[in-house]
Structure formats: C-alpha cells, structure tokens
Amino acid sequence: MKPTVRRNRAVTMSCVLALLCSVSAAALAAGPEIVAGPAADPTCYVPWASQTKFFKYPAKPGPYRIALANGFIANTWRIQMIKTSKAYAEQPGVKAKLKEFKVVSTGEDVAAQIAAINNFIDSGYDAIIVNAQNPKAFAPVIKRAKAAGVILVAFDNILDTEEAINVDVDQKGLGVLWANWLIKHLPSGGKVLEVRGVAGTSVDTDRHNGIHETLDASGKKWDVVEVVGKWDDPTAQKATADAIAVQKHFDGITAQGGDTGVVQALIDAKHPFVPFGGETENGFRKFCGAHSKDGLVCSSAGTGPAQVAVAMKTAIDALEGHVVPQSVKLPLAIVEDPNFKDGENYYSSQSDNFFVGNAFPTCGINFTAQEIMGQSEANQ
C-alpha cells in the first residue's frame, strides 16, 4: 500500500474515533436514560428501594480516566479506603479498562474538594468517584459534571441528589442497630457515651439520627453524652478519656469509629467494661473477643473501605453502557457477641488499624491484606 493511502486511512480512522467520542460526550451530557431494571449485575447492584430509578448511560469507548476526590484523610478507614482504591485499580481486569486513575484528598475543606472535582471535570476525566465532605454543598458541581458528560459516583458520604449515582450502606440503619444493642443490654436505660464522626458528613448525621430516634422510641430513660472522635483512634481515645474524667461513669457506649482508641481509654481509666455498639476495626474486635467475659459485650458492624471498589466498578459499568441503579445499597458486615472468633472475623496477627470484612463477594470484590497495605494513601 502506498504511504499516501495509509496516511489517508489513518486520518480517516482518527476522524471516525474523534466523531464517536464527540457523539458519546454529547450523549453523556444529556444525562442517562431512565430504564426498567434490573441492573446488569443484579447480585451486586441492589437498588436502595423499590422506587429507585435505573440509569443507562450511552456507552463510551475505553480505556477510561477516572478520579477519586476524597475529603478527610486523617483516620484509619479513609487511609485503608485510599489504599483499597489503588489496589482495585491494579487488578488485571480493572487495570485494562483504565487509562488513568487519579487520587486527591483535600481534608475537611469543602470548597477545596469541590475545586478538585471542578479541576477533574475541566481536565476531561470520564468519571469521578466522590466521598463527599458535605452532601448539600455540591449542587453546582453536580450540574457542571452532567453538562460536561462526566459520570459522578458518590459513596460512603453520598450526594444529596438523584443526578449522580450513590453507593452506600444504610448508615441510619447502622445507628439503629447499635442503639438496639444498647437497649437489649441495658434494660433500665442509663448514661451512654456517643463517640461521633466527622461533623457535617452524611454518615455522621445519619448514624447519629438512627441512634437517637431508636433510643427515644424505646421508652427508657437515656442520658447521652456526645463527643467528637472523627472516626480516628487517637482523637476518639482522648475524647473518651476526657468524657470519663468529667462524667465518671457510663453504662454503655456507641462509637462510629476510632473504637480501638475508645476501649483503650476505658482500660487506661480503669472504667468497667460496658455494652458497646461499634464499627469493624480489627483492634476493636480483638478487645471484644478478649474481654467479653469481663463485660465488653459488643456489636461490631459497618461496611469496609472496599465500598470504594464497588463505586469504581459502578463507574466503569456505567461508562460501558450497562444498566445501574441510581442508588445502590450495600450489605453490612455484622458480628455480635458471643460470635467473635480469632482467624475468622478478627485477626490477632494483624494490625489493630485495619477494618475487617473489607470485601463484597456479591460484586466479585475481595482483597488480601497484603494487596491493600502494599499501597500508599498519598495523592497520585
């Protein structure tokens, strides 16, 4: 074939690809088509409710540029989540579909997180995964993403909109679960320490509301003392120690994270062990397994940081034109006394700073500790 002919064909093919990308971007900007369910992967993508809509975006050619816009980073869960996202991006079946995976954490500054998302939109990313610092502050950037044909998938701290995809567990239901555990083990009510998460986030608000609505509805008398632990062991430990110093005694505890630190504060203060509804940190479960007979009667429930991988999978499937729910409901990982078993649902040989149950088998998502801990939490 003559060089001129080859060049002409190459130019023609480039033009065709450019046209396809242009048409795809324009179609994405129009938003998804609302279609009948089920989802393309119904065992993974469980709709939040019977009235949840199903989205079908126009298929876009890969490989894709996907970004993770995280906010707060200074706790074990967020660090493990960032590492998990990178581990998932390196799995062969996922890596082949990614041209680029970018991670940015902006701290508690909502404006900085929104600016990061705007930058990803301006840079032409195909999808952006978001752990929102404040769910109600994102309306303008959600509209910008839609206009640019960028798919937004929020997880954990989700977005207050039906124009993006949300992936989460029932955070309020988690608060209800913990409160019911205290109601069961404190038949006369009592004084409860509530260790909250990061202020302003939907997770903290939903869990808090679930706890209080359930305790209030029990008909028992409760005195709830609230402190802020930011889902972080050192912060939660200090907040608990300060609360014990002032209040002297608690009949029960519920904590959203940093639970290993909370129990350590009890031990340091020589406070009796009490019923505890908490998260899924390995260190917390170690304590629950070791001190059940001493009164540390635990309900350990939550969702592992691997939900970021479900959000990434959702974004890729949406870009490929597969049907997904607008709101995906993930299962909780629950272990309650007396069912704590070393080597099964906690691991004495592993670090305390590790969230157990970091898998979603129904989505084909699982990780070894080595896969996750071999990654860095730094921006990339």
Task: Give residue spans per PLM region.
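Coiled-coil-like amphipathic alpha-helices with heptad-repeat character
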Residues: 1-4, 73
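A residue-level marker of the well-folded mature domains of exported/periplasmic proteins
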Residues: 28-380
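Bacterial N-terminal signal peptides
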Residues: 14-24
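Bacterial N-terminal signal peptides that target proteins for export
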Residues: 3-16
